[in-house]
Every structure is written in structure tokens, then in C-alpha cells.
């Protein structure tokens, strides 16, 4: 794996997380969807990822990918849990009375693609690509300043 390959995957991860963040903001700020508690938790784990990746790109430090993989793994679990709640229309132990219901489906494409599923896919891609970078980079160097 060469340094250009690493930089390309870093950029891919950055754009994935950046567009995920922008999509989240679009639905809440432009479309005026009120995020539920689980949506907020997903945002907590998604929003720092593009910032961490940008700093990693600028400092040419691959170690930032560890934080990205950690954040995306937790975000993936929350997003998948949220999707299951929407599929089964069950109550969440996290959602409070008087707040937006976590089972409420705001957007649905093709009969099954909801916002938590889109979030799950985004987190899964970030997690998978990040994990691949970690595994492959061990062969290139000791995870320090991998690319120029």
C-alpha cells in the first residue's frame, strides 16, 4: 500500500463523513425535522469525524484513524438500534416521554430506506474503510506520518 493510496482513502473518509454531517444538518435545519434522542446520539459520534480526519490529513498523521474507527463503531451500533426500533415500531429505552419518538419515520425511500438506515450505511462505510486503513498501514509503517 503506497502513500497515495492512504491519502485517497483518508479523503474518501473525509467526504463520506462530511456529506453525512451536511445531510443531517439539511434534514434538521432546512427540512425542519426535529431529531429524536437517538438521532442526537448519532450526531454526537458523526460530527467530530470530518474534523478529526481533516486534522489528520493536514498533519499527515494516520493515528487519527483510530479515533474515527472508534467513533464510527459506536455510531453504527446506535444507528442500527434506531433502525430496528423503526422497523418494529417499538419503544426505545432511550427516548423520553414528551420528546420526538424514535420510532417515528420522517423520511422513507423505496419503502425501507430511512434516515437511521442511511446513517447506518454511512457509519458502516467509515468503520470498514477505517479498519482497512489500520490493517494495511501496519505493513507500510508503524502508524506514524505515513504519507507525504
Curated annotation (Swiss-Prot):
Important but not absolutely essential for the production of the lantibiotic sublancin 168, it may also be required for the stability of other secreted proteins. Not required for competence for DNA uptake. It is a multi-pass membrane protein. It comes from Bacillus phage SPbeta (Bacillus phage SPBc2). Disulfide bonds join 36-39, 95-102. One of its GO terms (molecular function) is protein-disulfide reductase activity. Gene3D superfamilies: DsbB-like. It holds the Pfam family DsbB. This is Disulfide bond formation protein B. The gene is bdbB. The lineage of its organism: Viruses, Duplodnaviria, Heunggongvirae, Uroviricota, Caudoviricetes. The keyword DNA-binding does not apply. Belongs to the DsbB family. BdbC subfamily. It is found in: Host membrane. InterPro entries: DiS_bond_form_DsbB/BdbC, Disulphide_bond_form_BdbC, DsbB-like_sf.
